[in-house]
Amino acid sequence: MLVLVHGGLWDEPVDAGVFWDRPGVTAGLRAAGADVLAPDRAMRAGSWAAEAEHLAAALPDGPQVVLVAGSNGCSAALRLALAAPGRVRSLVLAWPATAGDERLDALIRAAVPEAAGLLAGGVLRGVTDAELAGLRLPVAVLPAAPENPVHRRRTADALLALVPGAVELPGCPEPPHPAFRPEPLIAALTGWTG
């Protein structure tokens, strides 16, 4: 099963419908034969761990899942993979959000009083570089192409260097970006997950 973890943060109302459904990702993956679950993240959660707990509660009982996370959803998905490694078979980090962006950090601080914990991390918010280097599951990284201020190429490159055995999937614009087309993403995901 593919579990899609949407992006977005506290500056705008983004849910699974806006991020995955409307752009055609969920339907496209199902048409390609994938079993797909796209839960909404816990919006305005005070920590990445709280988001991970929320996601864990949405996971079905049964076999391990493949987490496909977009943008800031990568931090929540990584926290889940670290907290419950027996539930996660592999991880796709698509369009990982660049940490240390002053504009985004200011928006988070304004919206969430506990922002310090949300902004902490190294390459990604909510996860230390040592935790990334300690991952022991298959990880694929899909960069934003072209890059933008929130999804920089350097973040994807740093993840590929830090995570043992991480592979790069072909990049594409992120949803709900107007240039996004679901077909390249669906092909990359179905090709990598088998």
What are these regions (language model features)?
Residues 68-77:
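Gly/Ala-rich beta-loop-alpha elbow adjacent to hydrolase catalytic centers
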Residues 1-29:
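Short, surface-exposed "cap/lid" segments of acyl-processing enzymes
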Residues 78, 82, 91-115:
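Flexible "cap/lid" loop of the alpha/beta hydrolase fold
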Residues 164-194:
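Catalytic active-site module of serine/aspartate enzymes centered on a nucleophile-bearing elbow/loop
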Residues 23-46:
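Conserved alpha/beta-hydrolase
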Residues 148-155:
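Conserved alpha/beta-hydrolase "acid-adjacent" motif
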Residues 49-65:
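Conserved acidic catalytic loop of the alpha/beta-hydrolase fold
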Residues 135, 141-143:
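Short beta-strand/loop motif that positions the catalytic acidic residue
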